[in-house]
Every structure is written in structure tokens, then in C-alpha cells.
From Swiss-Prot:
UniProt source species: Homo sapiens (Human)
Family: Belongs to the glycosyltransferase 31 family.
Pfam families from the UniProt entry: Fringe
E.C. code: 2.4.1.222
Protein name as it appears in the record: Beta-1,3-N-acetylglucosaminyltransferase lunatic fringe
Topology feature Cytoplasmic, residues: 1-8
Gene: LFNG
Amino acid sequence: MLKRCGRRLLLALAGALLACLLVLTADPPPPPLPAERGRRALRSLAGPAGAAPAPGLGAAAAAPGALVRDVHSLSEYFSLLTRARRDAGPPPGAAPRPADGHPRPLAEPLAPRDVFIAVKTTKKFHRARLDLLLETWISRHKEMTFIFTDGEDEALARHTGNVVITNCSAAHSRQALSCKMAVEYDRFIESGRKWFCHVDDDNYVNLRALLRLLASYPHTRDVYVGKPSLDRPIQAMERVSENKVRPVHFWFATGGAGFCISRGLALKMSPWASGGHFMNTAERIRLPDDCTIGYIVEALLGVPLIRSGLFHSHLENLQQVPTSELHEQVTLSYGMFENKRNAVHVKGPFSVEADPSRFRSIHCHLYPDTPWCPRTAIF
């Protein structure tokens, strides 16, 4: 009897020892990915499985009773929630999501010489509009800025070497506008630069904000960023043959607020934009230059417009732009809105009569070290 019990005990011990050896020698399971760790942490915060999150809080939050079930203080909860959100962040290589909701790729280094800013103007506005831009924002980075105009101007040429005579009509017609845009596009492609940005001669460009925005996207990707002036896609009639047209819908960034296109996308636009093709493409829909850009990008290439509230035109109420957020805006403008003077409301060293566009005051607000800005200015 004792001998039989001893034999059973020895067999049990041998079996247990063998099981331990197998467990120790087996490969350990791989550690969970950071995102999975984050999701597990969030699930632990949410309490037992099946607890429903409170409306509006998303998957990361549950009912208050469940949230505090496994933590003992608010500071511990927020610490764990912050760590969980960080761990459950975008997967490797994915784009961070900024405050405006648009996913953006990781930043790439960007210098002023990487950006080609085309300023469209006409000779009759050289003194009235262009001189103001040369005095303010263009003076900070002349190497970035290329002025496209329809008339010779020796004074302008002496002030900046980047003047392009387009040989286009001075009329404000869709054909003349498309002619200038075609020249802008071709010059950008020839430049080899990473980014093409178009603005009008009534725009103020905040160069630091522009570089910050563009550095959020890789220039090799398809990027078309700007601000639409309509609350819905525009409808055009696309001519597909001599006697046949069809409706087409697309979004476009208004040229009056400015827009930017990456080199990667600009190269794909070449069949419809390079040489004389841009003019032909514009005739297919019989719309102006900025609409034609949107048509090529959205309707023909299938690349969606990235809407940004940092671009502004005179078609919106500019007095709603907060002075405290001026440093974040990419473009500003001035003009008339609903039959009233339309400009950014900003206090500064210059009166409205002396500075109706408010561009000088804006410039001194952004660059107080400018020699002609009064040192005692209060904003």
C-alpha cells in the first residue's frame, strides 16, 4: 500500500517537473503593440466588459462610475488616461491629427527657398496694391515671391528681380486669368521647388504660418490646401466633345484667399496644366483659373481639397478674425463686404485713414522689429 502510494507520488512529481520545464523553454508571447496597450488601458478605465461609454465621450470614456472603478484618485485617472491615449495614438507612420481635424503627415524640414509664392497682379495695381505688399510681407522673403503681371514696370523690376511678364491680357476675364495661372504653373515646375502657392495682390501672407502649415505635409504627396468660398461643390458643364456636355461637381479653393499645391500633385496635373493645356482645360468648363485648378485636382485626379480656415479672402467678414490669433493665419485680405469696408480689426500705430487695408498694422504686430514700425506701438 505504501509502496503504491510512493510510486504515484513520484509519478506526479515527475509530471509536474516536466510541465514546468516545458513552460520555461517555450517561446514567450510577443509583447502587445503600443496601440494595443493603449486600448487595453482604456478598456481597464472603462470598467468591466460591456460597460457603455457616455454619449459624446467616445470609446475612450465610460460612465463615471465605471471610470473610477479601478483608480483611487482623479490625478491617477487623468495620468492613466493621458498615458493610454498616448499609447493608443496613431499607428507607426500614420499622420497626427491637428486641432482642425485634418489628418496631416509627419512634418518635414522646410526652408523659404522650398516655396514658390506666385502673386497675380495687373499693371494698373502696381502702385495701389503691389507697393504695399513689397513694403510689408514680401520684404521679409523676396526669394520666395514671384510677381506675375501683364505690363513692364522698371521701378518694380528694380525693387525685386522676380517679376514675370505673362504676355496675357490686362482684362479681368476668365481667359486672361487662366492665361496668368498657366504661366504661374509652368514657372513653378521649372523652379524645382517643393510647394506652389498662389495669392492675389490684395492678400497679406504670414510667411511663418505658411511654412508651418506646409511643413505639416510631405511635398511628395497629393496636397491641395485652401479655403472654398462656396458652401457646396460648384457645378459646371464639362464639354466632352463638340456637341456633348455633362455636369460635373467639385470643390475648389478660392484664389482670393490663396491656396497651395504640393509638387507631387502639381506633376500629376501636367497633362491638363502644362504648356497650353491649362487654357484648353479651362475652356472645357468655361470657368476662371481657380475653378479650373479645382476641376483638375478634384474632378480629374480625384484628390480632395483640404479645407483650411487659416486662409482668408475679402469675400468673408474679416473683422471676425481675432487679433489674438493673427499669428496663426496664413493669408489675410481687405476690400468690401456687404457694401462696407472689410478689413481685419486690429489696433496699431496707424489710423484707419493712414492704413485702410490694416496690412501695415498687421505687419508691425507680426514683425515689431521692422524699421518703420513705431517702437511704442500698442496692439
